[in-house]
Amino acid sequence: MKTVYLFLFMMSSIFSISCSSNANQVNNMDNLKSNETIENSTNNMEKDGLYAKIKTSRGDIIILLEHEKTPMTVANFIGLAEGKIQNDKKSKNEPFYDGLKFHRVIADFMIQGGCPLGTGTGDPGYKFPDEFHPDLKHDRPGVLSMANSGPNTNGSQFFITHKETPWLDNKHSVFGFVVEGQDVVDKIAQDDFLESVEIIRVGKDAKKFDVLTSFENGQKEFKKEQLEKQKALQD
């Protein structure tokens, strides 16, 4: 009977990415091939866009942020990374993610970080809605997506995949993709540190991206849609 319970626990860990009260997680599954890594960082950032350079205790990860397709989610990530969005864990202008741990790692599945408590239970003191785009799927290694505890409960926690995880589509908001450093993602172990996040803006549109406005507009749009749905049900 103990064997059955252990099996069920392992399966539930594999098929969900949550901001959970359980700090002890199961590590399992295979390794990714190194050919998913692109090694020339200069070439990777020649394309206009918003990039996040995540410095870790294992090396650097560079991510292209999908600010045009998921502006609210990207704005939240940048706002926290640069200390622009008010939260109850860090003071104004203090980078939120610097010094936090990757508190949950499941081999051949994903690495998860962004919890200010280092346990998977923390958040920035607010929640914001899901933001799904039909072109953004968990269809490859190196997908950057939001961890949550249910619909519309996004905060600061995020994960990066080791492989495609299609069962997470339309449950977790994808907002970026690794363009360099997938080998670093694969090396990250539980309790390794995220040392800093540097946001790099390439091109006019990226430089004009307004973090606070994009975050506020996304929430307003969600509230508007909710009111319209409620009204439709009443009619």
Tell me the role of every PLM-derived stretch.
Residues 17-235:
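Cyclophilin-like peptidyl-prolyl cis-trans isomerases
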Residues 1-4:
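Positively charged n-region of N-terminal signal peptides that target proteins for export
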Residues 7-16:
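Bacterial N-terminal signal peptides
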